[in-house]
UniProtKB/Swiss-Prot annotation:
The species this protein was found in: Drosophila melanogaster (Fruit fly)
One Pfam entry name: Coilin_N
Protein name: Coilin
One Gene Ontology CC term in the entry: Cajal body
Source organism phylogeny: Eukaryota, Metazoa, Ecdysozoa, Arthropoda, Hexapoda
Recorded name of the encoding gene: coil
Phenotype caused by lack of the gene: Viable and fertile with no obvious phenotype. Loss of Cajal bodies (CBs) in the nurse cells, spermatocytes, ejaculatory ducts. Loss of CBs in the adult Malpighian tubule cells. Histone locus bodies (HLBs) in the same cell types are present and not affected. In stage 8-9 oocytes, the single CB present in the germinal vesicle is unaffected.
InterPro entries tied to this protein: Coilin_N
Basic and acidic residues bias (residue ranges): 223-234, 251-272
The keyword Nucleotide-binding belongs to this UniProt entry's keyword annotation: no
Disulfide bonds: none
Length: 634
């Protein structure tokens, strides 16, 4: 056979790119066993067998020439491992008595719970059997279920007694090595005398493998029929115990296979992350489906970022400059500004529109258009009330310095229908505005509805030779303007909003007046008490005690050292808090001018009282120049 290569399917062992591999076949090889060893060395595998691509099994002892007709190979592992893993079970005991137990019962296993040796056993100190347990079992959990040996010594003893205890598991048999077999052969004549059952014969494949292999492993001596019987019996009696004892073995096998896979990945320089992602994404399927499907890996960049690092998102900001679209000049609405403005405009006035046209009129002389005679005002008190009411009917139109009433404007327009000129009006002069008699002529004597009567209008002259124009206005055609009462409060005579009061009838003589000045009387008694207490006072260096009399000064503004200090205040300590250093003082006397400053130091809840509150709550550091009164003995 010449040198060649062949495709090998390793999907039973790997889920990544190694599941389809190409293997070199050397012509110097004799049988299939050499090819199996070569694949095991390449991929760090153990106990594999080969099949052809059409499903034909290749025995290990078969010649290598059979591969000429094969298109491809597939590697797998037997579930039972009859030829490599197992040793024949221990010989059956011949007696049911406890004292005649065989030596095989003292084999110690590597289990999760310690196995206690039998107390009545004669061979407790047999070190040869205990050292065998150092070799851990390499059998998987699935393989243990399939490779059940014949009935063991312990299982027959328990079934004969009728107890529900579980028989010896397959892990006990799997731990026996070739040394056990040789020792069993030496002790065979002794066991034959005691046992009544027959030994199971070796299989031909197992015997050939023992002769050829340099370091043979355990050999199975049970037939297929006995294996099936023991398997069904073990599944009925104790499946849970079997899974628990074999759990440790399967974990060791899985960890070794993972280490082998990692070393192989490092040698081939394949990233570990890619292999783990692809292996996790794919589901275990049949060999044909697994070979046809492609591995798909999903990646999320957000999941790869550290979770504890904050992410800052920057959004573009649009800055718009402020644009001035329109300028508006607001004029004051306060009546006091209007009066000042009207007083300054003695000789100038603005035109007002009429019928949608602006025209100018230049009268040449001053003339009173219409003046109604009103009864004289006799009472001077009504004069002061008339002054307040005269300014009240100012409306929003007065802002433009037009003071003509609607009735008067209509009368003037009707008088000049033939001409294209109009009259121009202004506010009365400053002298006329301050004259109370002229202002009150526009009001009736008993007018209580705050309605204004027609007012006299004046025409500004531009030429001295202008003819006088008179406009007779009927009282029925004049529309009165109602002034709300609340507008009286907005009108004042000065910039300081001080109302004008007529005090001409007040008697200034102090003899007949009831108003008398009150002399300020200084409280000398409190000063005398404090002066007497200072004679026997000593500086206060620590917290006073309850009942002590103290003299101290306080800041005029609490907490402000630059505000200055008050005069001395005398008081008696009623409570002292040693922890917060706050002293409650009941005042004895203090200067009357600092009574308002003491409100800052009043106790909470007492500052709103109408009584003379004298209890203060003061911190020790707020007592300035504090002194304590020492009682003297006469």
């Amino acid at each position: 056979m010449q040198h060649s290569s062949m495709k090998v399917d390793l999907s039973n062992f790997f889920k990544d790119e190694r599941r389809n591999s190409l293997v070199f076949i050397d012509a110097a090889w004799n049988n299939i066993k050499d090819l199996q060893d070569h694949i095991q060395n390449l991929f760090s595998l153990k106990d594999i067998s080969l099949l052809t691509s059409d499903g034909c099994y290749l025995p290990p002892r078969e010649s290598i020439k059979v591969l000429n007709s094969a298109e491809g190979l597939k590697a797998f592992r037997f579930a039972s491992h009859d030829s490599d893993t197992f040793v024949s079970p221990a010989p059956v005991k011949s007696s049911k008595k406890r004292k005649n137990r065989s030596v095989e019962e003292q084999v110690h296993l590597t289990a999760s719970t310690p196995l206690r040796p039998s107390k009545r056993s004669k061979n407790q100190n047999n070190s040869e059997w205990i050292n065998i347990a150092e070799n851990p079992s390499r059998v998987r959990k699935k393989e243990l279920l399939d490779m059940a040996p014949g009935p063991s010594v312990q299982s027959k003893l328990l079934t004969n007694k009728g107890t529900p205890k579980a028989p010896e598991t397959q892990t006990e048999v799997s731990n026996m090595s070739a040394n056990i077999e040789t020792e069993n052969k030496e002790s065979a004549p002794q066991i034959k005398n005691k046992s009544k059952n027959k030994k199971p014969t070796k299989s031909p494949e197992a015997s050939d493998q023992v002769e050829n292999e340099p370091a043979p492993k355990s050999i199975s001596r049970c037939t297929l029929k006995e294996g099936k019987m023991s398997e069904s019996k073990n599944q009925e009696t104790s499946p849970d115990i079997l899974s628990e004892k074999s759990g440790v073995v399967t974990k060791e096998n899985e960890t070794r296979e993972e280490q082998q896979d990692k070393t192989h990945l490092e040698s081939n320089k394949i990233p570990d992350k890619l292999s783990q992602l692809k292996a996790g994404d794919q589901i275990e399927k049949s060999p044909g489906i697994a070979a046809s499907l492609l591995s798909i890996s999903f990646r999320s960049p957000l999941l790869e970022m550290p979770f504890n690092v904050p992410r800052i998102f920057q959004f573009p900001t649009k800055k718009q400059q402020i644009e001035i679209l329109e300028y508006k000049k607001l004029k004051p609405i306060s009546p006091r500004f209007l009066l000042q403005k009207g007083a300054k405009s003695d000789d100038t006035a603005k035109q007002f529109p009429s019928n949608g046209k602006d025209s100018t009129l230049k009268p040449k002389s001053y003339e009173i258009l219409h003046d109604e005679e009103l009864p004289d005002v006799k009472d001077k008190k009504n004069v002061s009330e008339g002054i307040k009411r005269a300014v009240a009917p100012l409306c929003e139109d007065i802002i433009e310095t037009s003071t003509t009433l609607p009735g008067a404007i209509g009368a003037v327009e009707s008088a000049y229908l033939d001409n294209s000129t109009e009259a121009e009006t202004t506010l009365p002069s400053e002298a006329e505005a301050t004259n109370p008699l002229e202002l009150t002529e526009s009001f009736l004597q008993n007018n209580t509805s705050m309605e204004k009567t027609p007012k006299v209008e004046k025409i500004l002259p531009d030429d001295g030779s202008a003819s006088p124009i008179k406009n007779n206005v009927d009282s029925k055609d004049v529309k009165t303007v109602t002034v709300p009462i609340f507008e009286e409060q907005l009108v004042s005579d000065s910039d300081d909003d001080v109302m004008l009061v007529d005090d001409s009838n007040i008697d200034v003589s102090y003899g007949d007046s009831d108003i008398e000045p009150i002399p300020v009387v200084e409280n000398r008694q409190s000063l005398d008490i404090i002066r007497d207490l200072l004679r026997t006072a000593t500086p206060l260096n620590s917290l006073p005690s309850r009942g002590d009399t103290v003299i101290f000064k306080l800041l005029k503004i609490k907490g402000n050292a630059n505000s200055g200090t008050t005069e001395f205040v005398a008081g008696r300590c009623t409570y002292v808090n040693r922890r917060t250093k706050i002293v409650t003082v009941e005042t004895i006397t203090y200067p009357p001018e600092i009574g308002r400053m003491l409100r800052q130091y009043y106790m909470s809840g007492l500052d709103e009282s109408s009584e003379d509150v004298r209890t203060l709550s003061i911190h020790l550091k707020d007592m300035l120049e504090a002194k304590i009164i020492v009682a003297t003995i006469d």
